[in-house]
Amino acid sequence: YRVPRTVHKVAQRIANRITVRRPKHYNPKPEDGTVHHIFEPDIEKFKKGDWMIMAQCNYMLNEVCESLKQHGFYFENRGYRSISLKLAIALDTWKSLVKGEEVTANAVKDLYYFMKSITRIKRGFKNLPNTQADDMFTLASLQENMGLLATKDMTWDVAMDKISEDNKTYIAALLRRGEDLNRAPRIKVSTIHGTKGGEATNVVLYLSLIH
């Protein structure tokens, strides 16, 4: 009883095309639900709600992921976030430091990961030697004791000079959209097989790829 009646009908029609499979009998939910046949997805529809985008094979999803990136959407592709949690933490860490707030040594390590030695960090300080995970630092204390060369007037994209230009452009688009990079993405992209057991309020299935 996981899907509405109209969705169940379409799912059964697709499943019946599979010649070698073990039949599974299940009933739909009591409500009707809706199914829309779309020839070209309206990318702006992904602004709200949770989404699951499916295709038959991994390589078929590459174009989908590229389109989502170009339009500044945060998504998960086959279990991997389009922006890693480490990078999301690094962005928040720099923002906190510029505000004058304290951050943990672990957070600083994530930040330093995206900074180049010599240009943003003095040699020998990349891994914060002689520190504990919960030690606290400010921008000033990092500059004085932990080799930080980046300065308060630098924006995140200047301070974290190890991030590629493509990723900087993408992150800027995400931030303009107000995406929360610390939360699990609303949009998930996967193969049909890979989404087994997954659920979403809105589902996009590339039927043209299934014969």
Describe each PLM feature range.
Residues 1-210:
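The feature marks helicase ATPase cores and/or their adjacent C-terminal helical subdomains
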